[in-house]
Amino acid sequence: MLVDRYGNTFQSLTNVEKNTGETFIDGKPIYIKTLRFDERGSSLNSWHKLSDLGLSNVNDIWIDESNSFVHIETSSYSGFQSVNTYTASNNYKRATISVADGLNLNSQDGNDINMAWIITIKYTKTTD
């Protein structure tokens, strides 16, 4: 079993909902799920309802930025960026999530690019 420097077991990233074994400040269990979105273009404003992501009864939700990234591929570059990267006002990648609005993937780039968004979300449920 692999553990981090604090003795916590590593969570594998999967698109199947898993209970992390952690609890939120209100004592509710925290769940985790990793999603992938393949997008192409020089700008993006993509909205995804929580129900479309297979989520229901969500109470609190946030993006686990330590396990989320965007893989960028252009004709001259291939690499990874944080999901919230601001290089300039016309070059950024941003992911936000809320119970009311769902997941928003938003980007602007001067190039026509392929983007693979890997977004790991953590959340609690109203039913717990």
Positions of PLM-derived features:
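Extracellular receptor-binding modules and their adjoining Ser/Thr/Gly/Asp/Asn-rich linkers
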Residues: 2-58, 114-128
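Short linear motifs at secondary-structure transitions and domain/linker junctions
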Residues: 7-10, 70-74, 90-96
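Short, flexible coil/linker elements and helix-boundary hinge sites characteristic
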Residues: 54, 67-68, 104
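Surface-exposed interaction regions enriched in Ser/Thr/Asp/Glu
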Residues: 81-128
